[in-house]
């Protein structure tokens, strides 16, 4: 049987790793072992942060909605309660977009939520 020489495959593997690590700082972009270790960490960070991004956007939407409803004289949690009681089923992403891009429509939604709320804050809620 013929001997298998692996130089081409080994060089290709190293070249691919170094190309993927090209934007890293210092030895992590120039030395194969350091680049490979950094890539493994980067993949883990990427996986973790793809999951965290969903929560980050939800927090951002809630902050935007909270700022917009406070300008209308109501708190965020009372607004969400009013939406539920009024039967308005808009998610936070849509509400935040409406609050930023179309304040008049958002004011209409806030008024509908306020109207659905009971006058007494401590009154039992019938859902």
UniProtKB/Swiss-Prot annotation:
GO terms for molecular function: rRNA binding; structural constituent of ribosome. Keywords: Ribonucleoprotein, Ribosomal protein, RNA-binding, rRNA-binding. The keyword Ribonucleoprotein applies. GO terms for cellular component: ribonucleoprotein complex; ribosome. It comes from the Bacteria. Belongs to the bacterial ribosomal protein bL20 family. SUPFAM superfamilies: Ribosomal protein L20. This is Large ribosomal subunit protein bL20. GO terms for biological process: ribosomal large subunit assembly; translation. Binds directly to 23S ribosomal RNA and is necessary for the in vitro assembly process of the 50S ribosomal subunit. It is not involved in the protein synthesizing functions of that subunit. It comes from Bifidobacterium longum (strain DJO10A). The gene is rplT.
